[in-house]
From Swiss-Prot:
NCBIfam families: PRK04330.1. InterPro entries: Ta0600-like_sf (IPR023130), UPF0147 (IPR005354). It comes from Methanocorpusculum labreanum (strain ATCC 43576 / DSM 4855 / Z). SUPFAM superfamilies: Ta0600-like (SSF158436). Transmembrane segments: none annotated. It holds the Pfam family UPF0147. This is UPF0147 protein Mlab_1361. Belongs to the UPF0147 family.
Length: 103
């Protein structure tokens, strides 16, 4: 089985999407952008900040951080006050977190 090495350019950073640490960094950057976006409701920005802190906690394993963050993001994804562009970002973030191995 051939494994593809995908890279992703995000705000000038070259990220290796096969590396879970780089995927966590990408998620943190996405969450930071959401927390700074004034068009997103305050409660969703607060969850983005809390999720960012969970992903930055290096005391836990990468898989546990990803699973915890995914749970938090999933909880807020059904918020009826969320604008469409924010919901799209949430789905992209969830897809990235799901690609990180939990074990």
């Amino acid at each position: 089985m051939r494994r593809f090495n995908m890279s992703y350019r995000f705000w000038g950073w070259e990220l290796n999407m096969a590396n879970p640490e780089d995927m966590i960094k990408q998620c943190i950057m996405m969450l930071h952008a959401m927390s700074e976006d004034s068009t997103i409701p305050r409660n969703i920005r607060r969850v983005a900040d809390e999720t960012m802190k969970v992903l930055q906690d290096e005391k836990k394993t990468i898989g546990l951080r990803a699973a915890s963050a995914l749970s938090m993001i999933d909880e807020v994804s059904n918020d009826s006050n969320m604008p469409i562009h924010a919901r799209t970002r949430i789905w992209e973030l969830a897809s990235t977190l799901e690609a990180i191995p939990f074990d």
